[in-house]
Amino acid sequence: MEKLILRRVDRQNEEMILNFGPQHPSTHGVINFLVETDGEVLKRATPDVGYLHRSIEKIGELVGYPGFMPYTDRVDYVAAMFANEGYAIAVERLLKIEVPQRAQWLRAISCELCRIASHLVSVGTMVMDIGAFTPMLHGIRERETINDLLEALCGARLTYNYHRIGGVAFDLPEGWRDKVLHFLDHFDKFLAEFDRLISFNEIYVKRLANVAVIPGPMAINYGLVGPNLRGSGVDWDVRRDLPYGAYPNFKFDVPVGKGFFGTAGDSFDRYYVRCLEMAESSKIVRQALDSLPEGEITAKVPRNIKPEAGEALGRVESARGELAYYVISDGTNKAYRVRARTGSFTAMCIIEDISRGLMVADLVALISSLDVVAPEIDR
C-alpha cells in the first residue's frame, strides 16, 4: 500500500478510483458510488445500487391486496405515510371505491405531518453532512414531537400502516387536535429561528450557493420530481396540478427555486425549497383540522378483495416528489403486477452527470441536497 501511495504522489497525474460507500454516513443508506478523482476534483461519480433490494414489487404480487399495505411502509421508511396512500389510491380505483371525506382529510393531515418530519431529517442531515452537527439535533428534536403525535394517532413512529384501502385505520384520539395545533404554533417559530441561524448564515450560504446546479430542462429530462424539480425552477406539484384526496379544498403555495442566493437549481435552492414546504404543510394541517368533516373513516370494502381485471395508477406528492403505484389486476385476490415509481431513483441517475468537475467535498452536498433514500432506489 505504501509503495502504491508513493507511486501515485510522484506522478503528475493524481487520478484515483475510490469506493464512496456502501456504508458511509453521507450516502444516507447503503448506497455505493464509484468515484474517479483527479486530485480533489471529481471526474465521475457512478452510483452502484442494489444493496437494499428486497423485491418489494414482487412481494406485492405474492400477497393479497390488503396484505401488501405494511410492505409499502418499507419503500420509504423516512416518509412511509405517502407510500401507504399511493398504493391505497391505486387499489381504490380498481375497486371503484369512494373514500369518505373524513378519511381523505385524515390522510392529508397525516401525510403533511409526515412531510414535515421527512424534511426535518433532510435539512438537518444536510447541515450535518457539510460540517455543522448541532442544527441536525434541533431538527431531530422537532421530528420527535411529530413522531409522538403520529404514534398517538396510529400506534407507530416510523412504519405507520395507517392508511387502508377505502380509508384510514383510526380516527383522531381525544385531545389530539389541540396537541397538533400547539405543536404547529411552536414549529412556525422554530422555522423562523432555523432560517435566522442556519439558512441565512453567510458561511452556509457560500457553501451551497452555485454548487451542483441542475437547470430546469435538465431536471425534466432526467425525470426529477418534488423539491428537486421545483428547486430547479419548475413549478409542478401533484397536489395542485393533479389534485387528489382532500387537497382541492386547501389553499397553499408551491415554493419554487429562483436562485435565492446563487443560481436557480443549485444545492441551496433544493435545500431551501424544503424549508419553505414545511411552512406550507403547516398551513395545510391547520386548514384540514379546522374544516375536518364528520362521518365514517373507511368505506365498505369486501373482506376478500378481488378487483375486476384492469389497471390503475395511484399518484401522490410525497416528501421526495411524485410517488406512483401502477397496479394491474387479473381478477384474482392478488395483483398481477405492482410497480412503484419513486423520486430517489431518478435523483440518483443525475448524480453521474452533475458531479463532473465538482470538488470531492461537494459530492456530499449534492447527495444531501437531492434527499436520496436507499429503499426508494432498490425495490
UniProtKB/Swiss-Prot annotation:
Keywords, alphabetical: Cell inner membrane, Cell membrane, Membrane, NAD, Quinone, Translocase, Transport, Ubiquinone
Q: Is Cell inner membrane there in the keyword field?
A: yes
- Write down the superkingdom of origin: Bacteria
Q: What Gene3D superfamilies does UniProt report for this protein, alphabetically? A: Cytochrome-c3 Hydrogenase, chain B
Instruction: Give the UniProt subcellular location, in the record's own words.
Output: Cell inner membrane
Q: Which GO terms describe its cellular component?
A: plasma membrane
Q: What is its EC number?
A: 7.1.1.-
Catalytic activity annotated for this protein? a quinone + NADH + 5 H(+)(in) = a quinol + NAD(+) + 4 H(+)(out)
GO molecular function terms here? Answer: NAD binding; NADH:ubiquinone reductase (non-electrogenic) activity; quinone binding
Instruction: Please give the chief subcellular localization of this protein.
Output: membrane
Membrane topology, as annotated: Peripheral membrane protein
Q: Which InterPro entries match?
A: NADH_Q_OxRdtase_suD, NDH1_su_D/H, NiFe-Hase_large
Record's subunit section: NDH-1 is composed of 14 different subunits. Subunits NuoB, C, D, E, F, and G constitute the peripheral sector of the complex.
Q: Which family does it belong to?
A: Belongs to the complex I 49 kDa subunit family.
Instruction: Kindly give the PANTHER family that the UniProt entry links to this protein.
Output: NADH DEHYDROGENASE [UBIQUINONE] IRON-SULFUR PROTEIN 2, MITOCHONDRIAL (PTHR11993:SF10), NADH-UBIQUINONE OXIDOREDUCTASE 49 KDA SUBUNIT (PTHR11993)
Q: What is this protein called?
A: NADH-quinone oxidoreductase subunit D 2
The organism encoding this protein is: Anaeromyxobacter dehalogenans (strain 2CP-C)
Taxonomic classification:
Bacteria, Pseudomonadati, Myxococcota, Myxococcia, Myxococcales
